[in-house]
Amino acid sequence: MDIIVTSGPILKDPNPAIGSGWISEGSFVCTLDFDSYLDGEAFREADKLATDDLGQLGFYREEGYFGGTPECYADLGEIASGNKPGRESERERTIAINLGLGLEDMATAIRVYQSAMDQGIGTKLPL
């Protein structure tokens, strides 16, 4: 299985680099940058398209993002809770549009903290 994560700047008028036919069967794609790097055809080739927040995705659609992106199959909570099945075969192409998952922030924060500790830099804040 290929895993593709896009994490560039969020672009209002994207010029996607990943198009139709680029995502092989069985791949998982996670976009952290809205629809900036996948074109609508690449999104439509997914067997299952999910997001972390359907309401937020709707808001951004109204703001002009995700113009060529099809409707989502589910939100990630529905899949995690078992209310909708996730991957059902090894051949499925699955895409997750992550609009603001706090887990990503926490993973990054831990790496930054560990790096600062290793270098003996940073400022401890009273929280």
Where are these predicted regions, by residue range?
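Rossmann-like adenosine-cofactor binding region
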Residues: 1-65
